[in-house]
Amino acid sequence: MQVLPPGSTGGPSRLFILRPVATTLLMAAILLAGIIGYRFLPVAALPEVDYPTIQVVTLYPGASPDVMTSSVTAPLERQFGQMSGLKQMSSQSSGGASVVTLQFQLTLPLDVAEQEVQAAINAATNLLPSDLPNPPIYSKVNPADPPIMTLAVTSNAMPMTQVEDMVETRVAQKISQVSGVGLVTLAGGQRPAVRVKLNAQAIAALGLTSETVRTAITGANVNSAKGSLDGPERAVTLSANDQMQSADEYRKLIIAYQNGAPVRLGDVATVEQGAENSWLGAWANQAPAIVMNVQRQPGANIIATADSIRQMLPQLTESLPKSVKVTVLSDRTTNIRASVRDTQFELMLAIALVVMIIYLFLRNIPATIIPGVAVPLSLIGTFAVMVFLDFSINNLTLMALTIATGFVVDDAIVVIENISRYIEKGEKPLAAALKGAGEIGFTIISLTFSLIAVLIPLLFMGDIVGRLFREFAVTLAVAILISAVVSLTLTPMMCARMLSRQSLRKQNRFSRACERMFDRVIASYGRGLAKVLNHPWLTLSVAFATLLLSVMLWITIPKGFFPVQDNGIIQGTLQAPQSSSYASMAQRQRQVAERILQDPAVQSLTTFVGVDGANPTLNSARLQINLKPLDARDDRVQQVISRLQTAVATIPGVALYLQPTQDLTIDTQVSRTQYQFTLQATTLDALSHWVPKLQNALQSLPQLSEVSSDWQDRGLAAWVNVDRDSASRLGISMADVDNALYNAFGQRLISTIYTQANQYRVVLEHNTASTPGLAALETIRLTSRDGGTVPLSAIARIEQRFAPLSINHLDQFPVTTFSFNVPEGYSLGDAVQAILDTEKTLALPADITTQFQGSTLAFQAALGSTVWLIVAAVVAMYIVLGVLYESFIHPITILSTLPTAGVGALLALIIAGSELDIIAIIGIILLIGIVKKNAIMMIDFALAAEREQGMSPRDAIFQACLLRFRPILMTTLAALLGALPLMLSTGVGAELRRPLGIAMVGGLLVSQVLTLFTTPVIYLLFDRLSLYVKSRFPRHKEEA
């Protein structure tokens, strides 16, 4: 039993050093809790930070954008605008479709938002057109969020109408029921229907009109209640053959009599089984397909949702015929899992590098084992807290743990180094542990709480960026806190049991060589420090120059928002002239698809043409390009995009816009490019005046590329100008005119066929094959007051005009969205400033407002708060250090080291060609916490030497620098090597991790060199300042 000296109190570590069994069991409990917690943690790409978003889609086939806006979108918007918690409301009204996207405040639960939306739809129902085929349908999904999974269903033996029917009833409904799925859309529009194509000449010859035919069909196909007979003993349900199920039955339907002879529908029309909408189509690798896109609910875990779908697929596909093939074209979780695996590997590599550094400095296996146990214990214990906080294993939390390897080992290194020093002086291990741990306890507490103080401002960041980094900050803070506990409990206890003077002095050739090298380095540092202390003003000039340089670099460095990730999926928009038809777009997409599929990096391609909830106009097509895995292709996604755009550029009449999908989706609408800027006015006329001017100005800016807008007002429209007096004289109303046109050209859904499994529509239209274009209007006939038929041309004049293809609103006012990318050599910050300058140059009137949207708006907000965030971190750290040291001066000395970290980080980012984005800023904030640790270790020992040994300030700080040089070098290298795997990351998701590593490695390299010399000089400067203040104000001395 070792005899303890009277002064060996051990501080807070004493109990744990003297009770090794209890300490071991306590640490085992932390380890076990962490292992169990890890098993329950979900896996995700990023923390769940989605805005509660709901999309409301209303389809009204045949309606123009004007009609959709006034009769459908506007009534809905008026009701939605009264909902509490609504952050933003945008809408898009195009031919036959109205899409309203509602984004709510982050604090509003999605289920509450859903209830409000349903109530608003109910309130608007009476204001909507009475002949809407279906009421508005809402989905808990962000339309800008790319599908988590895309499946293609093809068949070489069955028509697409049958394939869609089976997919809709047997597959899509089941997938929709999976927890986390927000919306399952079937692109391709091949819903089965009975199509009735009227022969205009035939019905005109018989004196009939399309309205006569429509009335006959709707009256012949009904499905309503008929009652029952209730007798004394038996009840009989009434039924009838009131339903027609097939095209053959409709063909035989009698619609009128001529001279006593029946006129059947087949006599005046082509009746066939077809698709409900013939202007919709989807292709998978150029083959006709039903493309199933699965989108998650905002906030749902993408990995868990995708796993549930994968488990269901084999069972669902078994119910389909053998000729129907289901192919998973894309699964976003594949890249997410790969990214998480790469980050986990980098975490393990960081731990290995840190342990290697410890061994290199200590050159003792028992001394290396101690921090080697402390590091994984601190990290694993963090998982237990993460479970209780509902966190996930994602790129940001794993990055926090990777960075934490350099942080958590610092405490253990400081404790071990201090205890080892006493053992080498001849102290018994137990006494050395008590003395060393007691002496260093306050330093550990100072380091821990000052470092956590740096993270506090991250917890109070607003909006989506704050939510995004909350898990990062809390995970890192928990790891640091557990590390402090381990370092004050387990580490000194293990030192007391595992270290001895003999083991520490046991050396081999490698140990002796390392020792000689360290001795020479420390001696050189001592000589250099002595010279620096003799020339303090030169050193202070260097420190001041560093501060100025950091400010200058901050102003000039390119700034961005969030790194552009290579997730292996590209979303695209194909744009054609505004007058393009469905047939021409289908032909164009075939040409484009052929070029894209020839690229060696492309694995699969899906394309979609037609108007629905996702695609606003006929002259645009949607594409999803799935790339081969990163290790199977030579180029990153940006190089592939450039190559594809070059390949398609030679196809006449098309413009291809591509952008890589991202894990972080802030936008609420699908855009052609990565960034958006809106121009809003009170009227469409005001927009039509300013949109071309602003677009031309933006297209001339070198800071922007691929500038486009969704303003399309050159679509061709046939204006039917009815002579109301003539129509009234003939007994023809405007409703008769609208009905006749709708019957002929609106793919009008006039009746419903009910079956046990699904409902199908009867579609009425004119067969325009022999009378294309405006000539088809000459075939329209209307019924006059006397029962005769009148050609439309007798009461109307047809004019061809230009009309908008879609009308967009933002918060109920007309808006145009400009989309743009940032070319190579420029940053998002450059682009934003160029747009703002252009806006000032144009001198827009007061009733025209502009605003950045999505990630560009978030960038503006983040950029505005970044400086305050760093200031808040410094202030928080000053307050904590001031409380711990009971001094106003010493915290300033410690914080004087911070500019060196900023200079190193910013220079490293510039050299690496990386932008100063949110990830890099987080790295700089963490550097503030790391770099000040060097100063804390120096100043703590200097103050102790002055207080306990009576040394002069100069001798005290000089000795403290030499004594603390080795642990400072160890902890800095440990932190640097913890960040090194992130900086050198090349796998999936490396774009997200690399800026953090670059900033930290650069900052640590520069600050390590400078702070070792500037800190002692600044310490002596403030010491003299403190003496001067006391001499001028003796009252301070008396109070002290």
Swiss-Prot record:
**GO cellular component, as recorded:** plasma membrane
One Pfam family assigned to this protein is ACR_tran
Give start-end of the signal peptide: none
**SUPFAM superfamilies, per this entry?**
Multidrug efflux transporter AcrB pore domain, PN1, PN2, PC1 and PC2 subdomains (SSF82693), Multidrug efflux transporter AcrB TolC docking domain, DN and DC subdomains (SSF82714), Multidrug efflux transporter AcrB transmembrane domain (SSF82866)
* Keywords, sorted A to Z: Cell inner membrane, Cell membrane, Membrane, Transmembrane, Transmembrane helix, Transport
Question: Where does the record say this protein resides?
Answer: Cell inner membrane
Q: What does the record say about its membrane topology?
A: Multi-pass membrane protein
Q: Name one GO molecular function term.
A: xenobiotic transmembrane transporter activity
* Transmembrane stretches, start-end: 15-37, 345-362, 367-389, 396-418, 438-460, 472-494, 535-557, 867-889, 909-931, 968-990, 1000-1022
The primary location reported for this protein is membrane
Q: Give the family, as the similarity comment puts it.
A: Belongs to the resistance-nodulation-cell division (RND) (TC 2.A.6) family. MdtB subfamily.
Tell me which HAMAP family the record gives.
MdtB (MF_01423)
Q: Quaternary structure?
A: Part of a tripartite efflux system composed of MdtA, MdtB and MdtC. MdtB forms a heteromultimer with MdtC.
* Protein name in UniProt: Multidrug resistance protein MdtB
